[in-house]
Design a protein with these regions (language model features):
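N-terminal leader/linker segments that initiate helical-solenoid repeat arrays
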Residues: 16, 20-119, 131-137, 425-426, ...
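Solenoid-like repeat scaffolds
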Residues: 48-55, 87-94, 123-132, 160-168, ...
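Generic helix N-cap/helix-start motif at coil->alpha-helix transitions
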Residues: 56-64, 94-101, 131-141, 166-176, ...
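Residue at a conserved register position within TPR or TPR-like alpha-solenoid repeats
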Residues: 70, 104, 108, 139, ...
Length: 444
């Protein structure tokens, strides 16, 4: 975190400025007793001439000298005792009042009276005495004070002002504000604040915290904003692949597309083929298996069920085992017929036929033949869904370890898909997966 000079430290220099203005310099610094060169004296004279002159009243000057001495000697009780007389001066100037307020800040902090210190800070801010560079830090001090008192509203109020007045606010500080806003039910504001933290870190080429995405997910749930929630979850699973996050993404795709078979097959595929991903529920794995079987990809059903069983999500007994055995039998049958289907497809002018055969090879785990056949079909033309075909091609290429070619296929899928469409979004999930590297669990 960026080091910042504390505002309370700067009060010392303010207090010294008061002393100089009252011609009390001899009591301030032993360094001033040292002989100075003509050049140093000239520089000081120029600086003094350029500096704004403090406007202290005659009454203030008369009473302030002993108070300044007590300040210099850190006799804070004496300073506090002297302040009421100074505050009673008739018609005090603005500089009189600011000096008194400054001494009150120093003295209340010096004696350790936290309540009086906080009150002095609030008064100092309210009167506009704080230098602009100190306003944020003073609000942060107040936020810490009210946090200790468990006054959530005041904590949020002052931490918000700290952020607003701090040009170099850090991502962790934005997280704190986001948490306070979320606690206060300010979900829209919390989403925005946490998004700023994420964008700030990404702008530096660094990886945002997983927790920031998780907190945003809570915000969007409260706001019932599924569109924004999906975008946040997609970014989360791209950075931190996990079966729970994939399952949330898949569930939203399912709801938004009314369980569209093409979309769901691709969504399940990217989740389960990711070694760091998977699905978190039995229902999701069974839906993947069913979708794959209907689509003519029994090998994906096998991989789905075996992954779910291996991860302890899908029970190994009962109908699940029966479905697995049936899918394995279908794969064995396909392996016998696919060579003939591939030869026939090669002679067909329609590329769509090649793509369907390519799905069969992908199903059986022959990823090289899958990639070859799909590429041939795309080159022929006449493919009904180029986005779907290129996603399948990219998946096969990624299994072969050809990451660069896979990325090109995913980019082609994204370009072919309508803007913002589910398959275009799934292409982005694949691209994130390809950027991380790694291979899928062993194919069945």
């Amino acid at each position: 975190m960026t080091a910042r000079k504390t505002w309370i430290e700067s009060l010392a220099s303010v207090s010294l400025g008061i002393a100089v203005s009252m011609l009390l310099a001899p009591s301030i610094s032993l360094a001033q007793d040292q002989p100075k060169s003509r050049k140093e004296r000239a520089a000081e004279a120029d600086a003094e001439a350029e500096a704004p002159k403090a406007d202290y009243s005659k009454e203030f000057r008369k009473l302030a000298a002993p108070v300044q001495t007590a300040v210099n000697e850190k006799k804070w009780a004496e300073v506090l005792a002297a302040l009421p007389q100074l505050e009673a001066i008739p018609n005090p100037t603005l500089d009189d009042k600011k000096a008194i307020a400054t001494w009150r800040l120093q003295a209340t902090q010096g004696v350790g009276d936290q309540e009086a210190f906080a009150a002095a800070i609030e008064s100092f801010l309210a009167e506009g005495y704080a230098d602009p560079e100190n306003v944020g830090a003073m609000h942060r001090q107040l936020a810490a004070h009210y946090s200790a008192k468990k006054d959530n509203a005041k904590t949020l109020e002052h931490f918000q002002k700290f952020v607003e007045h701090t040009p170099d606010v850090q991502p962790d500080e934005l997280e704190t504000l986001g948490r306070l806003q979320l606690q206060a039910g300010m979900n829209a504001e919390a989403c925005q604040t946490l998004g700023k933290a994420i964008d700030t870190v990404k702008g530096k080429g660094e990886k945002p915290k997983e927790m920031w995405y998780q907190l945003r997910d809570r915000c969007y749930i409260e706001l019932k904003d599924d569109a924004s929630r999906l975008a946040n979850l997609e970014a989360l699973v791209g950075e931190y692949p996990d079966k729970e996050y994939y399952s949330r993404v898949v569930a939203i795709y399912q709801a938004q597309t009314n369980d569209d078979r093409t979309v769901m097959l691709n969504a399940y595929r990217v989740a389960v083929s990711d070694p760091d991903g998977g699905l978190s529920t039995v229902g999701a794995y069974l839906n993947y298996a069913d979708t794959a079987l209907v689509a003519g990809s029994p090998g994906e059903a096998v991989r789905a069920l075996e992954r779910g069983m291996k991860d302890g999500v899908v029970p190994t007994a009962g109908t699940n085992q029966q479905t697995l055995n049936q899918a394995k039998a279908a794969v064995a049958s396909d392996k016998k017929t696919l060579p003939g289907e591939a030869a026939s497809a090669a002679k067909n002018a329609k590329g769509e036929v090649d793509v369907k055969v390519g799905l069969g090879f992908y199903s059986t785990g022959d990823f090289a033949k899958a990639a070859e056949t799909i590429q041939r079909g795309i080159a022929k033309g006449g493919v009904a869904r180029l986005d779907d075909a290129n996603l399948l091609l990219g998946a096969a290429l990624l299994e072969l370890g050809k990451a660069d070619e896979a990325r090109a296929a995913f980019e082609a899928a994204k370009a072919a898909a309508p803007a913002g469409s589910p398959l275009g979004r799934i292409a982005d999930l694949w691209l994130a997966r390809a950027a991380r590297g790694g291979t899928a669990p062993a194919a069945g």
